């Protein structure tokens, strides 16, 4: 699934292309996404100008003068610029057509979303998909004290607490494993047992891991590409544990282990990461 670095890389890639530009038309070839695309949406947006291209967690937020379009890339989606004359291939479900550019949403599994939040419905932050999201990892308020306060009384394993997204957003499966490795924390540790000092290390590790991923254009394991069609390079360059089961730890040489937590694969070094 595209995580925060992949979504932010996409946002940066399309921001200068569409912000301040008028949408000529929205072409919906397949409306059956995670939630059906509203049939009135093309008419609502035709001829309107994109005022801002934002992001909250893993959601892209395209601000128009009468509302916000919410775009989620789902499990396997990508949003990239394509030549206007390029015929849509299989799974090219939605096009945003501008005078100078076309953006295409490619989503093989159709778990993505293209939704509309009109201004009269209230602030976008109150939308049900966004209202309960945690703090952004690069928000100045996010630190070890924030995590330690959130983890107090939480018996769930630390990795699952990170994936929940209500403490801090955007730390999905890949980056949770990588961040816990950097912080030296066993992913099976109960969240409430992580000390304040270790929470400091974890907050720093999350920021460092996500920064590396952003600098690398995200991670590509299967389907993800950025707005220009380039795959992300983080996994190939930086991954210390993810999908390295049985291979030697890059720090101590012990075999990397794989386990399943909450139906998600977790990778860790049993020597470097302590409970």
Swiss-Prot record:
What the entry lists under CDD domains is as follows:
EcFpg-like_N (cd08966)
Q: Which intervals hold the zinc fingers (FPG-type)?
A: 240-274
Which reactions fall under this protein's catalytic activity? Hydrolysis of DNA containing ring-opened 7-methylguanine residues, releasing 2,6-diamino-4-hydroxy-5-(N-methyl)formamidopyrimidine; 2'-deoxyribonucleotide-(2'-deoxyribose 5'-phosphate)-2'-deoxyribonucleotide-DNA = a 3'-end 2'-deoxyribonucleotide-(2,3-dehydro-2,3-deoxyribose 5'-phosphate)-DNA + a 5'-end 5'-phospho-2'-deoxyribonucleoside-DNA + H(+)
Q: What is its EC number?
A: 3.2.2.23, 4.2.99.18
Which residues does the entry assign to the active site, renumbered to this chain? 2 (schiff-base intermediate with dna), 3 (proton donor), 58 (proton donor), 264 (proton donor)
Supply the Gene3D superfamilies for this chain: 1.10.8.50, MutM-like, N-terminal
* Cofactor names: Zn(2+)
Q: Does the keyword Metal-binding apply?
A: yes
Return one Gene Ontology term, BP aspect: base-excision repair
Q: Does the keyword ATP-binding apply?
A: no
Cofactor binding comment, as recorded:
Binds 1 zinc ion per subunit.
Q: Which InterPro entries match?
A: DNA_glyclase/AP_lyase_DNA-bd, DNA_glyclase_Znf_dom_DNA_BS, Formamido-pyr_DNA_Glyclase, FPG_cat, MutM-like_N-ter, Ribosomal_uS13-like_H2TH, Znf_DNA_glyclase/AP_lyase, Znf_FPG/IleRS
Residues that, per the record, bind DNA? 91, 109, 154
Q: Which UniProt keywords apply?
A: DNA damage, DNA repair, DNA-binding, Glycosidase, Hydrolase, Lyase, Metal-binding, Multifunctional enzyme, Zinc, Zinc-finger
One of the record's GO molecular function terms: zinc ion binding
Cite the PANTHER family for this sequence. FORMAMIDOPYRIMIDINE-DNA GLYCOSYLASE
Q: Which NCBIfam families match?
A: fpg, PRK01103.1
Its biological purpose is as follows:
Involved in base excision repair of DNA damaged by oxidation or by mutagenic agents. Acts as a DNA glycosylase that recognizes and removes damaged bases. Has a preference for oxidized purines, such as 7,8-dihydro-8-oxoguanine (8-oxoG). Has AP (apurinic/apyrimidinic) lyase activity and introduces nicks in the DNA strand. Cleaves the DNA backbone by beta-delta elimination to generate a single-strand break at the site of the removed base with both 3'- and 5'-phosphates.
Q: What is this protein called?
A: Formamidopyrimidine-DNA glycosylase
Q: Which organism is it from?
A: Bordetella parapertussis (strain 12822 / ATCC BAA-587 / NCTC 13253)
Recall the taxonomic lineage recorded for the source organism. Answer: Bacteria, Pseudomonadati, Pseudomonadota, Betaproteobacteria, Burkholderiales
Which gene underlies this protein? Answer: mutM
